[in-house]
Amino acid sequence: MVSVLHSISTIIIIAEFVWGNLSNGLIVLKNCLDWINIKELSTLDQILILLAISRISLIWETLLMWVKDKLISSITIEELKMIMFSFMLSSHFSLWLATALSTFYLFRIANCSWQIFLYLKWRLKHLIVQMLLGSVMFLIANIIQITITLEKRFYQYKGNTSVNSIQNEFALLIEMMLFNMTIFSVIPFLLALISFFLLIFSLWKHLQRMQLNSREDRDPSTKAHRNALGIMVSFLLLYTMYVLSLLISWIAQKNQSELVHIICMITSLLNPSVHSSILILGNFKLKQSSLCILRHLGCRLKSQNTPTT
């Protein structure tokens, strides 16, 4: 029974891996082609490209961590550190770019008369750049803290390159990484949550104005509000599941529960894979491109299956 569940879980992980690479690859490819043809990119397209690239990297790093048990006897402690730091880098930018996307939707769609809101809306691109540059400071602080802690605790493993030593070092890296990721993800998560509630407030005010004017609630502004809210809700839920899966995976690893670890791996891959698909469905340009690709593939398959006379 365990072997059957293990096989099913492996198939699901591979499917998420392929789907995540395809969906994020579509975002990168479509926007890069537009960049080549039009010679410019909007702020939204720039955020989407960087977010998709970071998620492709995160998917690969997550898969690499999943197979580390099979490679544990053939890799060094330094290589394990490289894997962990690459995972931290991808996860960091995936979170902050998604937060920047939520902020962009808030200021581009919401209608507020507050002076500070109007000022930030006017300087939206500058605000996004400052947010991402500020996040680099959090990333540097995170890496420095882990590096210092590792240097202090590494002496007990110095000169010991056995499998048990590497496993102990990997467990130590996992423990510190999860703790730091949880601490340093509080601020971007709160920013995304604040953007979500402010957008709800903006939608509520907009619907009130529509009712006072006896107009329908299917105008473009209402549709844009609901579309952005759907993207934000999916991001918040999927990222919460992602963090919880990392924590549960760490506990399962300490208790040597491989099945729970695999289930958590499936959950952690949902965030970079499924949310990118939701972004495609919520973006008219990307949605049309994906439909064109599907129609083209359907025609190719139909022509191949049609018998020739």
From Swiss-Prot:
It is found in: Membrane. It comes from the Eukaryota. Residues 29-46, 103-127, 204-227, 283-309 are cytoplasmic. Pfam families: TAS2R. It is a multi-pass membrane protein. Keywords: G-protein coupled receptor, Glycoprotein, Membrane, Receptor, Sensory transduction, Taste, Transducer, Transmembrane, Transmembrane helix. One of its GO terms (molecular function) is G protein-coupled receptor activity. Residues 1-7, 68-81, 149-182, 249-261 are extracellular. Glycans are attached at residues 160, 180, 255. One of its GO terms (biological process) is detection of chemical stimulus involved in sensory perception of bitter taste. GO terms for cellular component: membrane. Belongs to the G-protein coupled receptor T2R family. Several bitter taste receptors are expressed in a single taste receptor cell. PANTHER family: TASTE RECEPTOR TYPE 2 (PTHR11394), TASTE RECEPTOR TYPE 2 MEMBER 124 (PTHR11394:SF33). Putative taste receptor which may play a role in the perception of bitterness. This is Taste receptor type 2 member 124. It comes from Rattus norvegicus. The gene is Tas2r124.
